[in-house]
Amino acid sequence: SAATVSDTFSITVANTNDDPTLANAIADQSIDEDSALSYTVPANTFADVDADDSLTYAATLSDGSALPSWLSFNTSTRVFSGTPLNANVGAITVKVTATDGSAATVSDTFSITVANTNDDPTLANAIADQSVNEDSALSYTVPANTFADVDAGDSLTYAATLSDGSALPSWLSFNTSTRVFSGTPLNANV
């Protein structure tokens, strides 16, 4: 006889948290100093197979220390923003961490390279007005700290004209190497 008997029962598969994963590495970024950075970490950078598990984001330097003062990270929009200055030229390594609802994390690092751009020299210390008596020799050295340039390795060259851009009077010369004005004005130059 082919008699059978059966019973039914349920098997419940309990969900356990799966750690989020790195799906797509974050691309390195480059920016010129004094330029505004705005970079959004792509939404598909990290993945989590757990249904209804949302990720939250944080960013630090790769060693866990805070981002430099010029750089901020919006944890809601995943946007890095800021304007690096001359002092920030070079590369930093940034770590972005995604955390799921069960506090499991995954991280990725990427570099932000700040390229140097030429900065104009600036007037650091105004040149004091000078006076000389007619028929007396003038010798005045423009102080070395009169002008400044924040660009490392830049050296300044000097030239002198009248304030309207025209040439110096014939009695006055300027040595561009030593920054020395010299000459003897006559009565006609008063």
Segment roles from a protein language model:
Residues 64-85, 94-95, 165-186:
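Strand-loop-strand motifs at the edges of beta-sheets in extracellular beta-sandwich domains
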Residues 48, 74, 100, 149-151, ...:
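Acidic active-site catalytic centers that drive phospho-/nucleotidyl reactions
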Residues 1-3, 98-104:
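Short, solvent-exposed loop/turn segments at the edges of extracellular beta-sandwich modules
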Residues 4-5, 9, 18-60, 87-91, ...:
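Extracellular ectodomain surface segments
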